A protein has these predicted regions:
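Conserved N-lobe motifs of Hanks-type protein kinase catalytic domains
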Residues: 28, 64-67
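Protein kinase glycine-rich loop
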Residues: 22-28, 33
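Activation-segment/catalytic-loop signature of the eukaryotic protein kinase fold
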Residues: 75
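AlphaC helix of the eukaryotic protein kinase fold
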Residues: 51-63
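A short, low-complexity linker immediately N-terminal to eukaryotic Hanks-type protein kinase catalytic domains
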Residues: 3-21
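Conserved N-lobe loop of protein kinases adjacent to the ATP-binding glycine-rich P-loop
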Residues: 37-44
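Conserved short submotifs of the Hanks-type protein kinase catalytic core
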Residues: 79-93
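Conserved beta3 VAIK motif of the Hanks protein kinase fold
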Residues: 47-48
């Protein structure tokens, strides 16, 4: 059986005319994680890409506050994906 794998590189993509994707920094079971730069403020953020079906769970994340959970600061929908803009914490997971 032949399996086709499609890799989409989001480097250079700009979300909400504000967050510029710089590089992919991780891959998980449900999506990809990117490093982005806020073109307005100069801050760096983590951008978690999820399928649009996870929209409800993504929006609930903004309600969670705990020192061990990166804070969600923005949310973007684009096509069949949603993007969570979150605190970027350097290091390994």
């Amino acid at each position: 059986m032949k399996i086709e794998v499609i890799i989409i590189n989001l480097t250079g993509m700009i979300l909400k005319m504000r967050y510029c994707i710089l590089e992919q920094v991780g891959v998980g079971g449900e999506g990809h994680l990117y490093l982005a730069r806020d073109m307005e403020l100069g801050n760096y953020w983590a951008v978690k890409e999820l399928p649009l079906e996870k929209k409800r769970e993504a929006r609930l994340l903004r309600l969670l506050e705990h020192p061990s959970i990166p804070r969600m600061v923005d949310y973007v929908e684009n096509g069949d994906h949603c993007y969570l803009i979150m605190e970027y914490i350097r290091g390994k997971s």
